[in-house]
């Protein structure tokens, strides 16, 4: 990968997210691009937006714009850019994220990857708008047992016990850098040479679960996934990829979360648990999805 001409390619997927981009792009420019010591490019994939996003994006001469003919989902859109990647590392970044002045130094993540060749993915600490952690950036493998303990409230009751808190691995020290099982596609930095080995995102997942699926495939290929709390990105959650009000967007997000959760378990755990356990989980997911 030494012949790559760019150190980092930041891939931003957009669907009707002009208002989000109006906040993200200046923060990215001011708080990272103007300070970094690395060669960085910014690629925005527009997933067939129906708002004025494309016209807005064309006003930025430092952005490489890819226009999709249709909205094929998160994996499909990001893969359009990944297929033409020319950087040593890529970062998937939601359009509803924001960089901060002191904490969003991606150089630290690149430097860590440069000195740790077994790391395939590294994620910053992702905070929600209210300052609370976005727990999706720090996850364990969502086995059926992990899902059961999470949805039954056992993780919340016993957050420091590994047996009951594997879904978000809340028993680990969140103030220190350490390995995790999975992170969120809202902000993840990936080694390009590892993608060549692992493969692209699974486009059968329209939205959600494709990041967890990718992380699982990275781990199965021998790569580590690292969480670094010293780097922070703000996530204004449920604002990207929906094109609706926050309430409607959250409702849509909930539906797709449970829809793709079922896909994930069908893909990876179809024959690994007793039939009755899989049946009960499927009933629960169906109930939550339609609620």
Predicted regions mapped to residue ranges:
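Conserved donor NDP-sugar-binding/catalytic core segment of glycosyltransferases
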Residues: 101-136
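N-proximal low-complexity "stem/linker" segments adjacent to membrane-targeting elements
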Residues: 1-30, 38
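Active-site-adjacent helix/loop segment of glycosyltransferases
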Residues: 216-291
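Short aromatic/hydrophobic "clamp" motif used to bind/position activated sugar donors
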Residues: 90, 96
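A short, conserved alpha-helix in the catalytic core of glycosyltransferases
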Residues: 173-200, 204-232
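Short, flexible, basic/aromatic active-site loop/helix in glycosyltransferases
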Residues: 141-180
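A conserved acidic beta->alpha catalytic loop
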Residues: 18, 27, 44-54, 70
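Glycine-rich, basic loop-to-helix element that forms the pyrophosphate-binding segment
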Residues: 67-85, 100-102, 108
